[in-house]
Amino acid sequence: MNDTATRVETRTWTDEVLARVRQALPMGLLGVAVGTAGVIGARLVAHAHGLDNSYTVRDPAAITDAFWFVGLQSNLGVMLWIAAASCCLLGAALLRGVPGARRSARFLLASGLFSLWLGLDDGFMLHDEVLPNWQGIPEIALYALYLALMGAYLIYFRGTIFRTKYPLLVAAGVGMAASLVIDQFFNSHFFEDGTKFYGIVFWAAYLFDATLTLVRQEIPGL
């Protein structure tokens, strides 16, 4: 009797593990694909520039033998961009399919994708170096594109934005605008990057709070 019960428990546990493995398989395969693309892509970039693989796989401070805090504020800004993007995309996933929450889900999706792109831009200096120098796209044209996208974002989602603590968004805009003005007309990294960092902090704070607010509004009792 005890042996039979043990076999049943073992079979049940095994079935549970196999079921979890099957459920995790699609995301696991995606993880393998992304990881492989990152590893191979980094090596291809190094090879294309005639550099050792270490230049694209190790930390910049280790490669340049610099202090650990080199780029500290910039790195923190990139972390905030990506954290804000992750928060928004999770919120969009939670609201997907919720009746009447389509506009909120779209707002969070757009906010997340925009934040993700800005984080990648900031981290890899896309608008500063890569696109102007390698693709011939003027930096001012990229600024104009970003401003146009932000304008469209504000107009299209204005109803949703007014349901959130939008003064935080205004503060983010002031910080970013001040950084752009200082970059174009003055020569002060302290003030340019300082106001930009404030803008990123307020942008992230706004989106963290907006995600929480909208999810609670659209899913009562959560």
Residue ranges with predicted function:
Residues 3-222:
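Polytopic alpha-helical membrane-helix bundles and their juxtamembrane interface segments
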